[in-house]
Amino acid sequence: MKYIFLFLTSFVFAQQTQSVDFEIANGQLFVNPKDKTIAGTVTYLFDVLRPIDTIKIDAQNMQFSDVKLNDKPVSFTTNGKQLLLIHPFKKGKKWVQFSYEAKPKQTLYFIGSEANANLQIWTQGQGKYTSHWFPSFDDVNEKVVFNLEIVFDKNYQVIANGTLKEKITNGNNTYWRYRMQKPMSSYLLMMAIGKFDKKTQQSNSGVSLEWYYEPKDAAFFEPTYRHSEAIFNFLEKEIGVKYPWGNYKQVPVRDFLYAGMENTSATTFSSRYVVDAVGFNDRKYTNVNAHELAHQWFGDLVTAESSKHHWLQEGFATYYALLAEKELYGEDYFYSYLYEKAQQLKFASRTDTIPVLNAKASSLTFYEKGAWALFVLHQKIGDKAFKKAIKNYLKKHAFQTVNTNDFFVEIEKVAAFDTKLFSKVWLEDYKFNTLEANDLLKKNTAIKVQLELDQLRNTPLAEKKDFLMKVLQSDVYYTVKESVIFQLRKESYDDIKELLALAMATKNWSIRQKIANLFPKVPEAFKVDYETMLTDASYQTQEIALFQLWNSFENDRIRYLDQTKNWIGFNDYNLRVLWLALALNTPNYNADAAALSKELIQYSSLDFEASTRQNALESLIGFQIIKPEVLHNLVNATTHHLWQFSKFGRDNIRKLLKDPKYRTTFEELLPVLNENEKSQLNRLLVEK
């Protein structure tokens, strides 16, 4: 997963795993989108390893009935967090069956609605706990073979872990029966329901690859899933261990919590990565795609036993994703990425004093410093030894949990390498070893130029201008040329116009995007060249360019609006939202202001994803188009499951409440709000 979480492992549960081994879970589930509830029947097969009088299954706020042990009623109780089976359990194989109901406040999400024909239902177990929607185990050390049968409206597709063994339609419902062969931790359990189509490919090793998409996004399929098959084939070969889960599926879902999630055999990812050919430049799914796939080995096959060793998942997935991108985009890309992350880590270590081997480490540390540590190790012991150690490590600990020492044992078997010193420097020290990092980075010619350029940051322009021009005229990797632009930020246009002409002439959309952000207002002398960025193959560049030109040249606003009136942009409508806001704030623009205002407000409503809504609300508030409907949509934002959007709503309401006019409007909204909205707004109204 692309954002960090913490495993919370209790001592009590650690004791249980020594006494009981849960082996197989069979569940039949019924999901009710109207009530946002889930119900089902679950059977667990387990082995009592030594006598125990209470067995616990994590179950958050669930109601249970028909609880039976080996087909006979058994005493049980619940405490709001667990189902407790009370019985003098003796050694041997047993099974427990029960029915349950729940209305989860998290981990099971209902997006859209059947009425609007845009319903999606999906789960997210990591960092949230699967035990909110399926009675299971919050402790990652308990690994189970999960088999789900999900019953839902026949007009929808249902995706879950494992292989679809049977699909039976009975009346208005379809029974989807998924089966797994190997055990996994509960946080990797998933289901996704929606109206999806799919295309299937086959890997070089014969694994079925299923890529899902919404029918409306059929034209976006190729750029969205670009390189997916190649990434799979590369990682399977590079890792040296056959993909362990039978088949592999990917499905984009709306308003997802993260960039992606590596559920076993079934990755869910954010619909923001559903892009067309232009959108691919700014929002390519490639890195997330490779990262989540790498987790199928590093995280799903072998799982860190506790959060202290979380780098064994995120650091490894980050590094192997980078190796996959190196295969696709070349060594310059690879070293440029490592250089960029080295700069971030060096800067972060000024205030972040928590090392990799610590449960409280930051995402940057777990992911990027973990990846850097692997890069150093890979370079030090050589490719052959590194691959052998990885292969042995995965095979030895397959379907188990691991710690860092387990990995080091395999390193020491293949190389005379001091893992203790390596650990002290790269995993136990919060500081970033810049000297060692730079020595490795200098193997790349582009980074040599980059490091030389870095030495000139505080050098007056006149003294370095010739060197900067040579860099821009060379065939060095484009990120180095972007660093030239970075050094021009505080210079006047007249002093840098020759450099800008060279940079613009590269026709590299990314370099030109850095130029688009260079000036608070576009210089008159740069206007004609700057206008060419309106046609660059980047929706992000176009967004910057349109606003900057509109803001800089008042007399040309209508011309710019006419030129861009059919723009849409990404699937969050970034260009359309900006265009509407600018059109509404351009006097004498020949357009139906009421219709434009209605459209912009609509983008802030429940009909759209959080990213679109936030874009629209920012424009509406920023340009003072603040109607009661806008404020209602802002209040609704505070109830959203995406914490960033919810915080955006709260922060903006707090600002608006300082104006008595808006405070009155908010108070007048209270009678028409639902209970959740009302609760959130009342809390803000009484804040001091």
Question: What annotation goes with each model-predicted range?
Answer:
Residues 9-10, 507-511, 529-688:
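Long, helix-rich interaction regions
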Residues 293-303, 317, 369-387:
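Alpha-helical scaffold elements that line and support the substrate/ligand-binding pocket
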Residues 401-557, 661, 677-688:
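Beta/coil-rich, acidic/histidine-enriched accessory regions frequently appended to metallopeptidases
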Residues 1-19:
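Bacterial Sec-dependent N-terminal signal peptides
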Residues 78, 118-121, 129-130, 148, ...:
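Juxtacatalytic substrate-recognition/specificity segment
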Residues 14-242:
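Acidic/His-enriched low-complexity segments
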Residues 308-372, 379-380, 397, 414, ...:
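Acidic/His/Gly-enriched intrinsically disordered linker/tail segments
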